[in-house]
A protein has these predicted regions:
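Conserved alpha-helical scaffold segments that buttress catalytic/binding sites
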Residues: 1-174
Length: 174
């Protein structure tokens, strides 16, 4: 994408020029299917999987509150062992439902939902979706959330994070 070429990759503090040290590529946006969360999640997971299988390590920036789950779902099947997730955001995104939606502000609840000791909420199961269960190699202990806080946090999500012993760091802890 042309906008990526506008920015300089040199760090004055570190004395490092990222484009000289690393092979970087902006893969662009992944197209979504408005109004269809399942097809959108499939599209996102396939794109991330393709990037990962090409030998690149995806660093994913942007999107909405739901995309954490399909991003990790695209990588998790290709990882031997557990996946580590670093989530940088002000929102904890750990509750099971929000505004009657299962993926708005909820991706990390569902990503880490398939592990021993995790109490699964199935009260919404009058329908079934492929993301009703977590990813088996994404344990809660491997999720680190940085920058969490402010007045737009979530009491239910914070409670789930404490129950699952998620490392949720606010700006004072970083």
């Amino acid at each position: 994408r042309r906008i990526s070429a506008v920015y300089d990759g040199y760090s004055v503090d570190g004395g490092v020029d990222l484009p000289e040290e690393l092979e970087l590529c902006d893969a662009g946006d992944i197209f979504v299917i408005p109004g269809n969360i399942e097809k959108t999640f499939d599209q996102v997971s396939k794109a991330i999987s393709h990037i990962f299988c090409s030998g690149a390590f995806p660093i994913i920036c942007g999107g909405d509150h739901s995309l954490g789950y399909p991003n990790v779902r695209g990588i998790a099947p290709h990882i031997d062992g557990n996946v580590g997730i670093i989530h940088i955001d002000r929102h904890i995104d750990m509750q099971d439902m929000d505004m009657d939606e299962r993926m708005h502000t909820t991706p990390w609840f569902w990503t880490t939902n398939d592990h021993e000791g995790v109490e699964r909420n199935t009260s919404h199961h009058n329908h079934s979706h492929m993301h009703d269960v977590g990813l088996s190699n994404c344990p809660p202990k491997n999720l680190v959330q940085m920058g969490i806080g402010g007045w737009y946090g979530s009491r239910p999500g914070s409670s789930v994070a404490r129950e699952r012993v998620i490392a949720a760091l606010n700006e004072l802890n970083i």
